[in-house]
Amino acid sequence: MEFKRCSGILMPISSLPGGYGIGSMGKPAHDFVDFLAKAGQTIWQILPVGPTGYADSPYQSCSAFAGNPYFIDLDMLAADGLLTKKDYAAINWGGDAAHVDYGTLYEKRFAVLRKAYANFLKKRPVPGYETPYPDDWYRFQFLSSDWLPDYCLYMAIKEANGMVDWQQWPRALRVREPEALAEFKAEHAGEIEFWAFLQYEFDRQWRALHAYAKEKGVAIMGDIPIYVAADSADAWAGRELFETDAEGKPRRVAGCPPDYFAADGQLWGNPLYDWDYHRRTGYAWWILRIRHALSIYDILRIDHFRGFDTYWAIPAGETTARNGRWEQGPRMELFRALHNALGSLPIVAEDLGEMFDSVRELLAESGFPGMKVLQFAFTGEDSVDLPHNYPRNCVAYPGTHDNNTLTGWFAKELTAAQRKQAVDYFALTKQEGTVRGMLRGVLASTAALAIIPMADWLEETAAARMNTPGQAQGNWQWRADAKKLTPALAAEIRVLTERYFRAAK
């Protein structure tokens, strides 16, 4: 795909302002769509919206299909008669409005959501004899039948076992013995349905938000990681999809080889795909996954695109990534299968880092736009990440969720020589401001699409950084201050957007 010249803003759902501990799909999200429209933006990029677990990373979700219950808007549940304000308004969701307190959310949010479910049970319609799904509750379950039952069962079993990794469950449940699963379903039917209810509410609220964004001329760019988490419904219920043994334990796991930045490489621990199985089944699971993603997003960014060309496979049990080896991925065969099944693929490829020539060839053959990041540019050489070198078919960023804010980066991460190079390159002045000058450079580039993180428009310090790779705790927490998302800021963004011919018509 190729974009017409345009721009957008990266703003995670979790970072939206609001009163209940984390951003949501209700008024905070709708207000942000209004802000984008006033600012002349046509794309809202978000991070993955799956349920989060250990370390709160949206890239390590327990499902490739489910939505995060934390994003369900409580006021919308109240408007539907499933809650009252007193059920949640007085709860302390964390003492710092600028950061998500995931521990507090975990302790308190589900109790409120269970109240909503209890009220839902009182209102739930009984299906008629003539049709299996006379309303949207049954319709949602029917349309989600490829993944919802396994996800809800996984979550119910996980909760019954103290939320431990599924590899630590009783063996009969771990290996999915039919009798054990049937017995659990019979004894925990209500708990299983609770998890279905959460996905139903997520779906209702998300589709309302998506429709509102379309009405305002704003497309939503979603994001999915290439791999699923080891502790996920996908790995538990679909072990044939991965390189696993009879017990479902990975034989090899994902990561990155040693490099200049990490002498031992990066050991991610995700189960690797059994690409031979996917090939034999016509990539059916991938078609299902991408079809689902494109049903909720207008554009899809896929993380770690290089893994479709070659991927680093590390024997399970290794403590570092040193002893891995490169293996061949599915390359264009996968994308041809996706195209044949789904038609045009509005995909953006995350192609950052060192790349083999074969990865560049795959990107070119796919036609997907890659990414360029300003913060990688100032090496003292004529870097491909300097704006004058951007190809048209790419997405330009000052930084991604894995980078510091521009303010933090310029102040702390550049040498004196690099800082001088940046000042000279952009002709930065005190009058314009350092950050505004660099954003000007990204917007002025020839890249068809420019995406600016909201934290950079707000000129936030390093405290607003979303993620520091390699840091286990303290990530994914930043939240924007609603008072800073002003009409004046929207007007300023629109002026710059129009100046560089990126504004919505």
Residues covered by each model-derived region:
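Catalytic domains of carbohydrate-active enzymes, especially glycoside hydrolases
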Residues: 2, 27-52, 295-297, 442
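Conserved, well-ordered alpha-helix/loop/beta-strand core segments that scaffold catalytic motifs
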Residues: 195-228
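Short alpha-helical segments and helix-capping/turn motifs at coil-helix boundaries
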Residues: 27-34, 204-212, 286-288, 434-438
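N-terminal catalytic cores of NTP/NDP-binding nucleotidyl/phosphoryl-transfer enzymes
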Residues: 8, 12-31
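Surface-exposed amphipathic alpha-helices with a cationic face
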Residues: 37, 206-214, 339, 363-364
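Outer-envelope exported proteins of Gram-negative bacteria
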Residues: 47, 219-221, 225, 299, ...
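Alpha-amylase-like alpha-glycosidases and glucanotransferases acting on alpha-linked glucans and related
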Residues: 1-5, 12, 18, 56-199, ...
